[in-house]
């Protein structure tokens, strides 16, 4: 039997004062049409990374709307996650030679997951599969029946994919009733996608990571980790991964420190069990920091959880997101929701989140350093930028909008 995740309870009514009236009304109308629909989400992990974080909000909100929603974790072990990490990087453009051995490992765990799903005897109206790890579950389960509609959700940028991996996976993905991408620019070239649907992700404004914290509370929490709250600090929150470029962030910090000598740098990362390369890059980042006492590295394994991330984001003088490649970069919306000035790379979904005056988009390390130095030297400019960024997120990147988009797709596929 597949492991089920209990995401707790959330009430859609709690968001009514935060979102637009029209959006709340449409959610009520869609909920009425889809009441009782059975939906199963399948992904690779229940912690670490943006997919799990989204599902911890999306699943209980859909339940509150009247749908019968479950969340299951596919079978996996270290050999499988090593393979899928290589697939993940390859789909984002990394060099990789697809081997018979890697295919066999990948197919074994997808087949085991599909078998458990089929043997459960449960019937589903919608099966919602997230990212490459479980992409073959539909094929190996036989589709579960004529009434089941299958959705494959890609949370990464596959616009310049390794063709071997894409050509291997795509015939299976093409069989899904819908392929959901964050934006058209992420889709792979040269493939047919009759079910293409564009749905950007979103953040939960009421989650522990995003709820309002007083400055005193945030300062107390941050100070417990040794960061001097009386001095400015730059922050990046991301996995320790070459695509997030923590080494480049350290280079930015070192350039800023030449102008603002008291500045500190905090790097916070979530270590997920399906990301074995993360540990290697953690140690690489530690070594690159070179023992600088003003550089701090933390993770969920050093007691930095959602509240602590909230505190760091709420208190940071500048939030950086120096991704080289990015699926969407929800941490940008998280920081903007806290009215923080953000300096971020012009990649992936980040430009969707940063509008004119609501953040600074950069392409190089010197540009990032200059932007950070400007924000540190002009607090009023930084405050106004943070205010504009927050309102853009309120209008476009909160979870009720994501739920609305998913429900629209369900209704279309089920013909209700």
From Swiss-Prot:
Keywords: Carbohydrate metabolism, Glucose metabolism, Glycosyltransferase, Magnesium, Transferase
Catalyses which reaction(s): an NDP-alpha-D-glucose + D-glucose = alpha,alpha-trehalose + a ribonucleoside 5'-diphosphate + H(+)
Coiled coil: none
Enzyme Commission number(s) from the entry: 2.4.1.245
Top-level lineage group: Bacteria
Activity regulation field: Inhibited by 20 mM Fe(3+) and Mn(2+). Partially inhibited by Zn(2+) and Ni(2+). Activity is slightly enhanced by 2 mM Fe (3+), Mn (2+), Ca(2+) or Li(+) and by 20 mM Mg(2+), Ca(2+) or Li(+).
A single GO molecular function term of this UniProt record: trehalose synthase activity
Thermal dependence of activity, per record: Optimum temperature is 60 degrees Celsius. Active between 20 and 80 degrees Celsius. Half-life at 60 degrees Celsius is 309 hours. Half-life at 70 degrees Celsius is 4.1 hours.
pH dependence per the UniProt record: Optimum pH is 8.0-10.0.
Gene3D superfamilies: Glycogen Phosphorylase B
Keyword NADP: no
Required co-factors: Mg(2+)
GO BP of this protein: glucose metabolic process
PANTHER family xrefs: SYNTHASE (CCG-9), PUTATIVE (AFU_ORTHOLOGUE AFUA_3G12100)-RELATED (PTHR47779:SF1)
Function: Synthesizes trehalose from ADP-glucose and glucose. The reaction is reversible, the equilibrium strongly favors trehalose synthesis.
Assembly with partners or alone: Homodimer.
Similarity-based family: Belongs to the glycosyltransferase group 1 family. Glycosyltransferase 4 subfamily.
Protein name: Trehalose synthase
Organism: Rubrobacter xylanophilus (strain DSM 9941 / JCM 11954 / NBRC 16129 / PRD-1)
């Amino acid at each position: 039997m597949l492991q089920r995740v209990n995401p707790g309870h959330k009430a859609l009514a709690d968001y009514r004062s935060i979102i637009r009236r029209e959006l709340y009304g449409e959610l009520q109308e869609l909920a009425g049409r889809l009441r009782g629909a059975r939906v199963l989400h399948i992904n690779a992990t229940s912690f670490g990374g943006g997919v799990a974080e989204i599902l911890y909000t999306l699943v209980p909100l859909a339940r509150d709307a009247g749908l019968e929603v479950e969340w299951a974790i596919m079978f996996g072990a270290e050999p499988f996650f090593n393979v899928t990490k290589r697939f993940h990087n390859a789909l984002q453009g990394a060099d990789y030679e697809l081997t018979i051995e890697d295919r066999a490992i990948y197919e074994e765990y997808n087949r085991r997951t599909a078998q458990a799903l089929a043997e459960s005897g449960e019937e589903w109206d919608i099966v919602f599969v997230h990212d490459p790890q479980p992409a073959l579950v539909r094929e190996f389960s036989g589709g579960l029946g004529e009434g089941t509609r299958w959705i494959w959700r890609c949370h990464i940028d596959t616009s310049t994919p390794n063709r071997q991996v894409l050509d291997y996976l795509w015939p299976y993905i093409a069989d899904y009733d819908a392929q959901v991408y964050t934006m058209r620019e992420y889709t792979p070239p040269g493939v047919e996608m009759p079910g293409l649907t564009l749905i950007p992700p979103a953040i939960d404004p009421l989650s522990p990571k995003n709820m309002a914290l007083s400055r005193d509370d945030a300062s107390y929490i941050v100070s417990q980790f040794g960061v001097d709250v009386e001095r400015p600090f730059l922050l990046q929150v991301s996995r320790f991964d070459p695509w997030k470029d923590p080494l480049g962030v350290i280079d930015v910090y070192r350039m800023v420190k030449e102008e603002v000598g008291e500045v500190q740098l905090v790097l916070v990362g979530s270590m997920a069990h399906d990301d074995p390369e993360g540990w290697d890059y953690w140690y690489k980042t530690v070594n690159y920091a070179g023992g600088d006492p003003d550089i701090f590295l933390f993770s969920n394994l050093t007691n930095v959880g959602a509240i602590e991330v909230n505190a760091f984001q709420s208190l940071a003088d500048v939030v950086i997101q120096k991704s080289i490649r990015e699926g969407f970069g929800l941490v940008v919306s998280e920081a903007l929701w806290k009215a923080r000035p953000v300096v971020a790379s012009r990649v992936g979904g980040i430009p969707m989140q940063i509008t004119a005056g609501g953040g600074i988009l950069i392409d190089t390390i010197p540009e990032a350093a200059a932007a950070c130095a400007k924000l540190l030297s002009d607090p009023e400019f930084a405050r106004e930028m943070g205010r504009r960024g927050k309102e853009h997120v309120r209008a476009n990147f909160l979870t009720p909008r994501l739920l609305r988009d998913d429900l629209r797709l369900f209704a279309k596929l089920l013909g209700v």
